[in-house]
A protein has these predicted regions:
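Residues immediately N-terminal to the Walker A/P-loop in ABC ATPase nucleotide-binding domains
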Residues: 42, 105, 138
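A short glycine-rich, Lys/Arg-flanked "PGG" loop and its adjoining helix->strand segment in the class I
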Residues: 127-139
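A short acidic, Gly/Pro-enriched loop at the edge of an enzyme's catalytic core
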Residues: 102-112
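A short SAM/SAH-binding and catalytic strip from SAM-dependent methyltransferases
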Residues: 110-125
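Class I (Rossmann-like) S-adenosyl-L-methionine-dependent methyltransferase catalytic domain
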Residues: 1-44, 52-101, 125-128, 142-227
């Protein structure tokens, strides 16, 4: 099941809602990677999966890309549309779950982004998500994923122990109700390499705020390609 109610509730909390258009640093670094790969598509088509308020969509549109975004929260997608309209960007935002069939043609996009959005999908939704992302990417298209990392993350292991979800390596965030999946390197690779060639994978440590406290968390930064 989608977690539309949980995400909508969270986006309505003013402290959770990101109103700025500054992109996430990991998305900017991904663009640097693309340049090193000699990626030279003119006005590339970009699909921002779980786009939230459109921070990363805005960044790609600002640099000449034709962007589409999918987001389950009405509050978030409305703000994303407002920001795009103010800037004069024609970004195609749709209120949809990324765990369902995508409304796009085969091989439509050059780039797909998943910046910690698919973590809350169920296993059945994730299978659809991966099949659909593969379908709508062009051959040779790039897929950037930032996912929660289990390896070496004591906070993730504590959450699994105290607030376990019904599926492997999942937990339910207390006071929020959002489910999250954390990944070992082995599980991530075995799941994603069925669909994509993994070009680069690294573990990154940063801090996440929850219940007015900062927690050290690990993430996987992964660059992939549709071969």
């Amino acid at each position: 099941m989608t977690q539309e109610k949980e995400w909508e509730r969270e986006y309505k909390r003013s402290k959770f809602l990101t109103k700025e258009n500054k992109p996430q640093a990991d998305a900017v670094r991904f663009v640097s990677f693309l340049r090193r790969q000699k990626f030279d598509a003119e006005k590339p088509k970009v699909l921002d999966l779980g786009c939230g308020t459109g921070r990363n969509s805005y960044y790609f549109a600002e640099h000449g890309a034709k962007v589409s975004g999918m987001e389950i929260s009405r509050t978030a997608i409305d703000l994303a549309k407002q920001n795009a309209e103010k800037a004069g960007f024609n970004i195609d935002y749709k209120k949809l779950s990324i765990g369902e069939t995508f409304p796009y043609e085969n091989s439509e996009f050059d780039i797909a982004l998943d910046v910690t959005s698919s973590n809350s999908l169920s296993e059945s939704e994730r299978e659809i998500f991966l099949i659909e992302t593969h379908r709508v990417l062009k051959n040779g298209g790039y897929f950037f994923t930032k996912a929660l990392c289990k390896d070496g993350d004591e906070n993730a292991k504590n959450l699994i122990k105290k607030f376990p979800g019904s599926e492997k390596d999942t937990y339910i965030l207390p006071d929020i109700g959002v489910k999250e999946r954390v990944w070992s390197k082995e599980d991530f690779v075995s799941t994603y390499e069925k669909y994509f060639q993994i070009l680069h994978m690294e573990k990154k440590t940063s801090y996440t705020r929850m219940n007015e406290r900062s927690y050290k968390r690990n993430f996987w930064i992964v660059y992939m390609k549709k071969a």
